[in-house]
Amino acid sequence: MFYWILLALAIATEITGTLSMKWASVGNGNAGFILMLVMITLSYIFLSFAVKKIALGVAYALWEGIGILFITIFSVLLFDEALSTMKIAGLLTLVAGIVLIKSGTRKPGKPVKEATRATI
C-alpha cells in the first residue's frame, strides 16, 4: 500500500509540475519555473521509490497516463484549451490501455529452487 501512495504522490507532483510550467509560460514569472523544477524532481524521486515494489511497466503507465489525463482536464479548465472529439477519443484509448496494462500484470511467484542432482 505504501508504494501505491508513493506512486500517487509521483502522479500528483508530475501534474502540478507540468501545470506550473504552463502557468509560468503565460507570464507569471520565475515562480512557476521554480515550482515546476521542484515538483518534477519530487515526482521522479517518488516514482523511483514506487517501482521498488510496483512493476515498472505498470507504474510508468499509470504515472504517465493518469498524468496526461489530468493535465488535459486541468488545461481545459484552467487555461481554456480546446477539447476536441479526437482528444476525447485519445484519452479514452489511454484509459483503456492503462486498464489493460494493470490487469495484465501478475505478481511474480516465489523463485523455484533448482533440484539437486544426485551423483553416481
Curated annotation (Swiss-Prot):
GO biological process, one term: glycine betaine transport
Domain of life assignment: Bacteria
InterPro entries hit by this protein: Small_drug/metabolite_transptr, Small_multidrug_res, Spermidine_export_MdtJ
Coiled-coil stretches noted in the UniProt entry, renumbered to this chain: none
Role of this protein: Catalyzes the excretion of spermidine.
Keyword terms, alphabetized: Cell inner membrane, Cell membrane, Membrane, Transmembrane, Transmembrane helix, Transport
Gene Ontology terms: cellular component: plasma membrane
PANTHER family for the chain: SMR FAMILY PROTON-DEPENDENT DRUG EFFLUX TRANSPORTER SUGE, SPERMIDINE EXPORT PROTEIN MDTJ
UniProt subunit comment: Forms a complex with MdtI.
Protein name, as recorded: Spermidine export protein MdtJ
Organism in which the protein naturally occurs: Salmonella typhimurium (strain LT2 / SGSC1412 / ATCC 700720)
Subcellular location: Cell inner membrane
Any one Gene Ontology molecular-function term assigned to this protein's record: choline transmembrane transporter activity
TM ranges: 1-21, 31-51, 54-74, 81-101
Membrane topology field: Multi-pass membrane protein
